[in-house]
């Protein structure tokens, strides 16, 4: 596929045209043509793999919630959604940036590829270290407000576990993302479709496992008071090294200067989802909350990240920052246009929506097979769960269309500014809607049991 771009520049003095310049560029690189079937196949398999990974992460969380450290340090449960969401934000924005670079041919040159990869990885490490610490602080603040306890030993444990988890997970998943994007480019597959969900298939599991292991290790060595502060300071001390590496790529340095607000705000949004999780996970009417939360949050986040990355790539290929194509001039498009038109981004939105119900049914069935009676499996709950999953994705896909247009109009990169907000909102929506499903199911079953009891009492002869 050959991409041809014509750039015109007019120079005026007053109202008179004094000169102009014309630049024609042709590039053999670009997005390969995709049919609905090819898009569905490319997206479906990675989404299923990511769902299995998130399901495994849910099973892990269902197990570790009973560990002594999670019972004693309640704020660890509040930390899970923002920390998992942070991992998702960093890896999804990294995947989206690398996919855009791959589709525009920027990483085909070996020297340029090394510069782009090293600087992107360094930026992710800086963001992971700093925001990992901020996530722990946010969890502590929310926990202090709710149960008014403050223990310096637990503060140090929480901060150190969060920083190490964010650092190691970002490093491992960043390397994985790089391999996936380069491999996808070589095999002629659109990285936008597969990079994010494949990384997510291991991301949640890796993040939760590292958090559980690190927090348990420091909890078992809590008598050595200097251990946690020393380790935390050591990881923070590596930050200048990552900044030095990132400086080799000036466009990436802009992310370090201006890309903090989306990541931090997304972390704060996810923290409220974590607060909901910590308040509901131990109550009997929310049985199964721990195992289903990573699935519903992860599926919604992955689907909206894929759509955002595709729209961003489309704009990078066919427009310039600050200028929206004719068919995308409206900031608040009609929802029918977003989901029902023949435009390429609308087609991909329909494909992603089509995957929601079958995907959730498969994951729910597998969870019930593994967990058995520990997960509510009534018909009412399954219906409510599917409705919640569909509602979450519809809202996120529409907001993705709106936010990408707004950020592009402001000459901002949607890869860096949209995905964090949307995945953070996806975590909050997913956790809230899932808790509502459990609550409605409990109320409806309670009413049905009450009606059955009343009918039995009425039918008993005096």
Curated annotation (Swiss-Prot):
<feature type="transmembrane region" description="Helical">
    <location>
        <begin position="424"/>
        <end position="444"/>
    </location>
</feature>
<keyword id="KW-0813">Transport</keyword>
<feature type="transmembrane region" description="Helical">
    <location>
        <begin position="41"/>
        <end position="61"/>
    </location>
</feature>
<dbReference type="InterPro" id="IPR036739">
    <property type="entry name" value="SLC41_membr_dom_sf"/>
</dbReference>
<feature type="transmembrane region" description="Helical">
    <location>
        <begin position="225"/>
        <end position="245"/>
    </location>
</feature>
<feature type="transmembrane region" description="Helical">
    <location>
        <begin position="121"/>
        <end position="141"/>
    </location>
</feature>
<keyword id="KW-0496">Mitochondrion</keyword>
<dbReference type="GO" id="GO:0061768">
    <property type="term" value="F:magnesium:sodium antiporter activity"/>
</dbReference>
<feature type="transmembrane region" description="Helical">
    <location>
        <begin position="258"/>
        <end position="278"/>
    </location>
</feature>
<dbReference type="GO" id="GO:0005743">
    <property type="term" value="C:mitochondrial inner membrane"/>
</dbReference>
<protein>
    <recommendedName>
        <fullName>Solute carrier family 41 member 3</fullName>
    </recommendedName>
</protein>
<keyword id="KW-0406">Ion transport</keyword>
<keyword id="KW-0812">Transmembrane</keyword>
<dbReference type="Pfam" id="PF01769">
    <property type="entry name" value="MgtE"/>
</dbReference>
<feature type="transmembrane region" description="Helical">
    <location>
        <begin position="194"/>
        <end position="214"/>
    </location>
</feature>
<comment type="similarity">
    <text>Belongs to the SLC41A transporter family.</text>
</comment>
<keyword id="KW-0460">Magnesium</keyword>
<keyword id="KW-0999">Mitochondrion inner membrane</keyword>
<feature type="transmembrane region" description="Helical">
    <location>
        <begin position="380"/>
        <end position="400"/>
    </location>
</feature>
<comment type="function">
    <text>Na(+)/Mg(2+) ion exchanger that acts as a predominant Mg(2+) efflux system at the mitochondrial inner membrane.</text>
</comment>
<dbReference type="GO" id="GO:0045016">
    <property type="term" value="P:mitochondrial magnesium ion transmembrane transport"/>
</dbReference>
<keyword id="KW-1133">Transmembrane helix</keyword>
<feature type="transmembrane region" description="Helical">
    <location>
        <begin position="351"/>
        <end position="371"/>
    </location>
</feature>
<feature type="transmembrane region" description="Helical">
    <location>
        <begin position="163"/>
        <end position="183"/>
    </location>
</feature>
<dbReference type="InterPro" id="IPR045349">
    <property type="entry name" value="SLC41A1-3"/>
</dbReference>
<dbReference type="GO" id="GO:0005886">
    <property type="term" value="C:plasma membrane"/>
</dbReference>
<keyword id="KW-0472">Membrane</keyword>
<dbReference type="InterPro" id="IPR006667">
    <property type="entry name" value="SLC41_membr_dom"/>
</dbReference>
């Amino acid at each position: 596929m050959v991409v041809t771009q014509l750039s015109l520049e007019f120079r005026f003095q007053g109202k008179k045209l004094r000169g102009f310049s014309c630049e024609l560029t042709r590039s053999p690189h670009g997005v390969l043509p995709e049919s609905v079937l090819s898009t569905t196949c490319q997206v479906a398999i990675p989404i299923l793999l990511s769902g299995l990974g998130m399901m495994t992460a849910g099973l892990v969380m269902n197990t570790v919630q009973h560990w002594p450290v999670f019972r004693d340090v309640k704020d660890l449960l509040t930390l899970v959604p923002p920390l998992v969401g942070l991992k998702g934000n960093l890896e999804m924005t990294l995947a989206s940036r690398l996919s855009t670079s791959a589709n525009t041919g920027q990483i085909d040159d070996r020297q340029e590829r090394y510069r782009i990869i090293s600087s992107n990885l360094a930026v992710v490490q800086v963001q992971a270290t700093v925001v990992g610490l901020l996530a722990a602080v946010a969890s502590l603040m929310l926990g202090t407000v709710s149960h008014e306890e403050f223990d310096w030993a637990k503060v140090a444990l929480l901060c150190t576990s969060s920083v190490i988890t964010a650092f190691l997970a970002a490093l491992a998943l960043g390397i994985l993302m790089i391999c996936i994007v380069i491999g996808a480019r070589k095999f002629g597959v659109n990285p936008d479709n597969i990079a994010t969900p494949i990384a997510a298939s291991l991301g949640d599991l890796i993040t939760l496992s590292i958090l559980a292991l690190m927090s348990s290790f420091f909890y078992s060595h809590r008598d050595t008071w200097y251990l946690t502060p020393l380790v935390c300071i050591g990881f923070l001390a590596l930050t200048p090294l990552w900044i030095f590496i990132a400086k080799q790529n000036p466009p990436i340095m802009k992310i370090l200067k201006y890309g903090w607000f989306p990541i931090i705000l997304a972390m704060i949004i996810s923290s409220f989802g974590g607060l909901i999780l910590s308040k509901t996970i131990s109550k009997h009417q929310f049985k199964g909350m721990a195992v289903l939360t990573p699935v519903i949050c992860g599926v919604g986040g992955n689907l909206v990240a894929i759509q955002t990355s595709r729209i961003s790539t489309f704009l990078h290929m066919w427009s310039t920052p600050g200028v929206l194509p004719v068919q995308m001039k409206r900031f608040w498009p009609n929802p029918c246009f977003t989901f029902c038109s023949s435009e390429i981004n609308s087609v991909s939105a329909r494909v992603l929506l089509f995957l929601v119900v079958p995907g959730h049914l498969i994951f729910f069935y597998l969870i019930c097979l593994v967990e058995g009676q520990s997960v509510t499996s009534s018909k009412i709950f399954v219906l409510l769960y599917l409705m919640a999953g569909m509602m979450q994705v519809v809202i996120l896909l529409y907001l993705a269309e709106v936010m990408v247009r707004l950020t592009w109009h402001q000459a901002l990169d949607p890869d860096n500014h949209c995905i964090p907000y949307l995945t953070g909102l996806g975590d909050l929506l997913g956790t809230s809607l899932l808790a509502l499903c459990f609550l409605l199911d409990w109320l409806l079953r309670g009413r049905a049991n009450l009606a059955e009891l009343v009918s039995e009492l009425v039918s008993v002869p005096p």
